[in-house]
Amino acid sequence: MKRMTKIVSLLLVALLLFGCTKIPTTTPDLSGVASDTAVLTEAALAEIKALGESPDDNYRTFYEVFVYSFCDSDGDGIGDLNGLTSKLDYLQNLGITGIWLMPIHPSQSYHKYDVADYYDIDPQYGTLEDFDAFMAACSERGINVITDLVLNHTGNDHEWFLTAVDYLKNLPEGAEPNAEDCKYVGYYYFNQEGGSGWHQIPGTNWYYEGQFSPHMPDLDLANAQVRAEITSIMEFWIDRGVSGFRLDAVKEFYSGNIAANVEVLSWIQETATSIKEDCYLVGECWDSFGAVSQYYTSGLTSFFDFPFGNSNGKIASVIRAAGTANTVSSYAKALQQANEAYSAANPDYIDAPFLSNHDVGRIAGFVNRDENKMKMAAAMNILMSGSCFIYYGEEIGMLGSGNDPSKRAPMYWNAARDNGTTNPPPECELPDEYPLGSLEEQIGDDSSLYNYYRQVIAIRNAMPVIARGNTTAEEALNINCISAQRKTWGEEECIILMNINTEAAQVDLSAYADWTLAASLSADGGEIALDAGSLSLPAFGTAILVPAA
């Protein structure tokens, strides 16, 4: 335990510095973040990183980026890869160790989930050379990158689909398509009957399946040649340095057929890891706890933990019920249940918790713009085991709800909306104001949501047991409105206590005399202290205990 003890000491020093040091209010260059604006002093952070650095593995702190809305480098109002590259110092300073890029390929839509070419970059975002420069800059900072891999469908302007459609238009009446004459006709689903989610090819009696949209024809993922194409695509981007892929809409590969979807995912996992042994894959399975558990039998490394994320997930539900003892105590039990079910299905699983993403409303709206509840939600998400995901702008309390474009608003760098701020996506409805202000307004405030994020991420990254530990409810402490969980990873352990309540609490730790306070997170600035076996926890406060030396 010597290594953990040194981390504890350094964390306590850093947290003390946070409590008594006013962060300078000079306006920083937002291409990065000036070193003197750190919540934990850079000296303390350097010592923590030197002694408590997490292993270089697939347990990461990811940041989801919609390039279109993140940072514009050339003044055309649309975010691009060079703009994102210019903000990597900002992300590194936040503590980010992984980036998930939403689709970056040529596309006819603003969101780019209708891919026209899997081997290129959309001209709005830049070039392959820009991508390579971005990857090199990420590598210099120890940031892994995963890209969105959209396999359920292509765009209807993809060469594969256009070639197949041209073939069908010239097919003699009454003749059946033959993949030996045009292999691409076997890449998609065509018939002459139509049906729900089927769309007619103009000038013909042929229909194609596109369950999401007529602009998104569905691929036949059982086709061996399609699988060969997928293999080639993964090889191409892995060769360019990506660490893995986010798999879009995996439960819609064969809608309603979990067994068929699991087979496809098993093949993708096996193929990806044959290309790159530690290739990281995370699937979007927007479904129930039971379904997500079944999908883990595929062997896929990760699935986004929808049962805990989103407006109706466990985290938001518990926070909205703050002060209700039974609901609060159910949180740690739910964490244990998920750990047991997911690990039974795949012993090598890595959970992928999140609060919100590009398809759902933002967490600020889930908790009625309450800053302390936003902080509590951040701690609950980031301190979960696995690779946690943070949606861009979440760290400054951005709002976003309603139609999809409104959930993908421009990153709010400053109130002047310059310094790389993009134009909104088409049909995006911006709020009149953001309740917590811009990054520029928060960066010098030591009590801001942004600086809270820096603090909780730094603790997560310094204590590997937090991301990698097996989670169980600590029943003796999981009472009243205190959520208590124990994490175990090898010989390391920690206990995380959260006061999910609007009132302060005293926690009796007399039975835990051999444990010490390693780190703490105060949402409202209230003191967190362990004295004579009693722990003081302010409203929405978090304490992390570790065994004493």
Each PLM stretch: what is its role?
Residues 504-523:
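Beta-strand-rich binding/interaction modules
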Residues 29-45, 135-136, 152-153, 158-178, ...:
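Active-site-proximal helices and loops of the catalytic beta/alpha 8
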Residues 62-64, 98-103, 146-147, 246, ...:
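Structural recognition of the beta-strand scaffold that forms the well-ordered cores
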Residues 1-8:
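Bacterial N-terminal signal peptides that target proteins for export
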Residues 20-24, 29-228, 239, 250-298:
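Acidic/aromatic-lined carbohydrate-recognition and catalytic surfaces
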Residues 40, 58, 336, 354-357, ...:
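Loop/helix patches that line or flank the sugar-binding groove of alpha-linked glycan CAZymes
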